[in-house]
């Protein structure tokens, strides 16, 4: 069966006759796209590393920053696998290593999507039921949820890799299809749930009897979700369909998968840009200050006063221990 291996592995079969030119052209386009992926991923690694460093060591920890920190970690891991995968293509290294990178890439991809969904749902809960959220919510919920989400994604991708012959055993067709169906359903669910919760929250903010002011953090999460839908979601859906339906491999060019991988790379790089951009907007204009202050503003879940910034509330910060 045809497996959805990443576009990091080129078929080295020599093509005779008139197909030589076409084969060379495909390889040239492939290398160009992967070169762009490496360049963009390097910038993304730097951005996510800065976010991780600031959230882990320089900013007070709260319920939402824990999720954002884990999202940055997932993006960092995903970008690392993309860079290594592109280098494997250039060096023509072991195909088995490429399969392993495929599993790690999907693991990081799903983990990042889980973090986005968790942030969006928890943000909606904090607005819809504020009394329960601030009084009854157990401590360390964010840390426990992140650990469970990482473990779940690791287990699911291990089963997917084993069933599809990407790790240690031969492919098992029906088991592989089953895992692919579960993965596809999970991707769709994790996209629909935060979209609906964010839309419901927006309606409550605009049309509710007690209007809730829009905070920077809501804007940050909304932009992150929108960017993922347009840039990150195509890879998850398309790669899953490649596993489940062989017809996709003949109908669509393999370069479509390469493009979706590239878009996923751009998505992982965009998140730090969103954080710092939202943090830099003040009184309808950009004000560039220290990265620490910009990130702190982007994580701010309290409304701003007309005269200036409010100090972020410590109540949400007390939900998690440092």
UniProtKB/Swiss-Prot annotation:
Organism superkingdom: Eukaryota
Membrane topology value: Multi-pass membrane protein
Residue stretches spanning the membrane: 35-55, 71-91, 99-119, 148-168, 173-193, 217-237, 261-281
UniProt-annotated glycosylation sites, renumbered to this chain: 11, 16, 19
Protein name according to UniProt: Mas-related G-protein coupled receptor member B5
Role description: Orphan receptor. Probably involved in the function of nociceptive neurons. May regulate nociceptor function and/or development, including the sensation or modulation of pain.
Cytoplasmic-side positions: 56-70, 120-147, 194-216, 282-322
Alphabetical UniProt keywords: G-protein coupled receptor, Glycoprotein, Membrane, Receptor, Transducer, Transmembrane, Transmembrane helix
Disordered: annotated span: 302-322
Extracellular side: 1-34, 92-98, 169-172, 238-260
Family label: Belongs to the G-protein coupled receptor 1 family. Mas subfamily.
Gene Ontology CC: membrane
């Amino acid at each position: 069966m045809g497996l959805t291996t990443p576009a990091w592995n080129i078929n080295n079969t020599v093509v005779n006759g008139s197909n030589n030119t076409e084969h060379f052209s495909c390889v040239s386009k492939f290398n160009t796209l992967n070169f762009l992926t490496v360049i963009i991923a390097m910038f993304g690694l730097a951005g996510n590393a800065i976010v991780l460093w600031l959230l882990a060591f320089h900013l007070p920890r709260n319920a939402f920053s824990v999720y954002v920190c884990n999202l940055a970690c997932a993006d960092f891991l995903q970008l690392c696998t993309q860079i290594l995968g592109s280098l494997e293509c250039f060096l023509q290294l072991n195909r088995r290593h490429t399969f392993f990178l495929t599993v790690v890439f999907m693991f990081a991809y799903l983990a990042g999507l889980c973090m986005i969904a968790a942030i969006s749902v928890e943000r909606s809960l904090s607005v819809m039921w504020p009394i329960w959220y601030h009084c009854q919510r157990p401590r360390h919920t964010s840390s426990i949820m992140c650990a469970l989400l990482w473990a779940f994604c690791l287990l699911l991708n291990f089963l997917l890799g084993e069933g599809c012959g990407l790790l240690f055993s031969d492919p098992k067709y029906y088991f592989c299809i089953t895992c692919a169906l579960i993965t596809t359903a999970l991707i769709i669910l994790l996209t629909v749930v935060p979209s609906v919760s964010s839309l419901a929250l927006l309606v409550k903010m605009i049309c509710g009897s007690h209007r809730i002011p829009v905070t920077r953090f809501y804007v940050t999460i909304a932009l992150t979700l929108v960017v993922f839908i347009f840039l990150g979601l195509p890879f998850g859906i398309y790669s899953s369909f490649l596993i489940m339906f062989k017809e996709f491999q003949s109908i669509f060019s393999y370069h479509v998968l390469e493009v979706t991988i590239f878009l996923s790379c751009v998505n992982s790089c965009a998140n730090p840009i969103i954080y710092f951009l939202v943090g830099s907007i003040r009184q309808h204009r950009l004000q560039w200050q220290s990265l620490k202050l910009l990130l702190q503003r982007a994580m701010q879940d309290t409304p701003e006063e007309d005269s200036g910034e409010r100090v972020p509330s410590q109540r949400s910060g007390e939900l998690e221990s440092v």
